[in-house]
C-alpha cells in the first residue's frame, strides 16, 4: 500500500489485468496515485492464440509511459500489404509504410503476440505487488461507513476498497453489470433495457499463430477478401506467422444469443480455405498444418452510452467493442486511459490534499464521457465500415473495395490519417520522440474536412457511373 505517498490518499481499484488495465496501472504509477489491480484469470498472460496490432495512436501513449522500446523489439513493423480479390485482381498498398514515414507519425503499424505484450506491460510495472490474479470480482458496493469509498468483493471472500473503481474487464464486464445494478438506485435513473441489449454480433474471428514459412516475408502483410470473409496473414519475427479470418455469420445476433465456438468449429471453417493461395506456392493449409495456437470467438460490436455511475467507470472493451479489421480495439482502449488520467490528474492537482467529493468524481467522469465519446464513436464507425468493405458485404461495398480503393486509395487514406492524428495523448508526460509533422498536418480541420468532402464526392460520382443511378 502506498496511500501515504499517493495524491491525497486517493486510491483506484482496477478490475481487469489485460492491455487496458495494465496500461492504466502504468499511468497511475506515473501520476503517483495508489491503485490495486484485480485480474480474474490465474495468470496475466495466457496463450490465447491471438496477435495484436499496435498503431501510432496507441504506440505514442505507450512510449510516453516508457514501454514502447521493449514493445518495438518484439513487434514486426508492416511495410506493405498485398491485397487479393476473388476475381484474381490484386494490388500492393504502401499505406503501412506511409504511416511510418518520417514525415508522418514516427510509429509503424506493428504486430506482436498478444501474450508477449501482456508480459511486457506486467514485467515493467515498478510494483508488481499491486497486481493480484485469480481475483474475480463478484459485486461492488458503497462502503456502509466511509463516505466516498467503494468496496469490491471477490469470489474468494476478499474485500478491496477504493475511491474510484475502473472496469477494464472486457466485453463480458462484471463491472459494467454492477454499474447497471447500482444505477437503479442513482438519482440519474436506471440504464434503459434498450441500451443493455444494444450489443450485436454479425461476425466471428479465427485467430491463429503458426510456425514461419520461408516464402513469406516478415512485415509484408497479405490480405484476401472473399464474399463474406477476410483473411489477413502477417509474417513476423522469431519464425512466427500471425493470421486471422473474419467470417460473417448466418445472421445478426444479439449479445448473449451469439454462438459459442469450439476448436472443431475453427477447424471446419479453416478446411474450407485449405487450398486458398497466400503467396507463391504457399496455401492456407500450409499455415494450418504449422499452427501453434488457434482460437475462435464472436466479434461483438457496440458503443454504450452509459460509461459511469457514481464513483464507478468502465473503459476499453467494457464500453466499446469493435471488430479487428481496423486494429483499433486495444489502441482505442489505450486512448481511454490517457483521457481518463488527464482529467483525473487535473482534478487531483486542483484539490491538492483535499479529498475528491462525490460531486467532484461524478463531474470528472461526465467530462471523460463528453470529451471522449465522439472520438470513440468515430473510430467505431470507421471500424464497422472497414470490416464490411473487406467482407464485400453488399454490392456498393464490393464496388468500393474492388474499384475505388486500389486506384484512389491515397486520397481515401487521408481519412485514416485524420483518425490517427486526432488521437489523445497523456498531457502531463513528455513526448519521447521528436514530433512528426503528420500529427499536426492530418489533424481534423476545415481544410481536411474539405479534402474528405471532395473524396466523398468523387466516390459518389464513381458509384453513379458504375450503377447508372443518381445519388444527388
UniProtKB/Swiss-Prot annotation:
Biotech and industrial use: Diterpenoid pyrones display various biological activities and FDDP C shows anti-cancer and anti-HIV activities. FDDP C also shows inhibitory activity of 42-mer-amyloid beta aggregation that is involved in the pathogenesis of Alzheimer's disease.
GO CC terms, sorted: membrane
Obligatory cofactor(s): FAD
EC number(s) reported in the record: 1.-.-.-
InterPro entries, A to Z: FAD-bd, FAD/NAD-bd_sf, FAD_mOase_fung
SUPFAM superfamilies the UniProt entry points to: FAD/NAD(P)-binding domain (SSF51905)
GO MF annotations, alphabetized: FAD binding; monooxygenase activity
Residues glycosylated per entry: 197
Main subcellular location: membrane
Signal peptide: 1-27
Subcellular location: Membrane
Transmembrane segments: 448-468
Membrane topology type: Single-pass membrane protein
Keywords: FAD, Flavoprotein, Glycoprotein, Membrane, Monooxygenase, Oxidoreductase, Signal, Transmembrane, Transmembrane helix
Residues binding FAD, per UniProt: 39, 53, 114, 317, 330
Pathway membership: Secondary metabolite biosynthesis; terpenoid biosynthesis
Protein origin, superkingdom: Eukaryota
Matches recorded under Gene3D superfamilies: FAD/NAD(P)-binding domain
Claim: Metal-binding is one of the keywords in the record: no
Biological processes, Gene Ontology terms: terpenoid biosynthetic process
Record-stated family: Belongs to the paxM FAD-dependent monooxygenase family.
Role played: FAD-dependent monooxygenase; part of the gene cluster that mediates the biosynthesis of diterpenoid pyrones. The first step of the pathway is the synthesis of the alpha-pyrone moiety by the polyketide synthase dpmpA via condensation of one acetyl-CoA starter unit with 3 malonyl-CoA units and 2 methylations. The alpha-pyrone is then combined with geranylgeranyl pyrophosphate (GGPP) formed by the GGPP synthase dpmpD through the action of the prenyltransferase dpmpC to yield a linear alpha-pyrone diterpenoid.
Protein name: FAD-dependent monooxygenase dpmpE
Organism field: Macrophomina phaseolina (strain MS6) (Charcoal rot fungus)
